[in-house]
Amino acid sequence: MSEQIFELKGNLFTLSVLHLYSTDINLLAEQLYIKIAQAPKFFEGAPIVVNLIEIKNNSLDFVHLKSLLERMSFNAVGVCNGSDEQHTQAKAAGLSVLNYSQDVKSESVKKEPNTSIVEKTVHLPAQIINGTVRSGQQVYAKDRDLVVLGAVSHGAEVIADGNVHIYGTLRGRAIAGAKGFKNAHIFCNRLEAELVSINGNYWISDSLQGEHWGSAVQIQQKNESLEISALVKG
């Protein structure tokens, strides 16, 4: 019997989800272009899933949609929360259909812009990285804090559903509160980041290069924006 050369295992990966509210692909292209221009490296090659929960008809051109996403350097993985007909059309366009259990279909489209968000407190022990997160690497601490005892290099990305603690220099990207925990913080010993994000609010390098650039800081969300303050050293 020959030696087994593969093994199939389940795993978890971080995917961006595009919540689509219109079938107008041209308008989507315009708005995506503006969004991507704010942080082009952050979205480059990012795997993305299109959430169809708010699309109530079958007029969406999935071939055009897939082409648009790939043209903008996304990796179009598939769709979720669509109708059977939408899923059939998506498959014909070369998109996968994913089950997305975190989304609950609403009975009707809500007209009020305010949405209730239930925060999930992180209880699991922190995930600790004993060293530097190097360029091209991505670390995700699911349902917990992330502690990096070294630096986060350019082109590296650290993500946590809770807080992110970096005991070295943050040169790459740090994302805290990835599942909507708005009270998450990012702490780092030296701020030189490409991007920081908390609960979906993010700043890129140009916005960070102020008085706290190169310093030890904590970053938190206040009033739907980010706030940076110096870490007090005892």
From Swiss-Prot:
Gene3D superfamilies: 2.160.20.70, 3.30.70.260
InterPro entries referenced in this protein's UniProt entry, alphabetically: CAP/MinC_C, MinC, MinC_C_sf, MinC_N, Septum_form_inhib_MinC_C
One Pfam family hit: MinC_N
Family from the record: Belongs to the MinC family.
Subunit structure comment from the entry: Interacts with MinD and FtsZ.
Summary of the function given for this chain in its UniProt record: Cell division inhibitor that blocks the formation of polar Z ring septums. Rapidly oscillates between the poles of the cell to destabilize FtsZ filaments that have formed before they mature into polar Z rings. Prevents FtsZ polymerization.
Protein name, UniProt field: Probable septum site-determining protein MinC
Organism for this UniProt entry: Pseudoalteromonas translucida (strain TAC 125)
Gene: minC
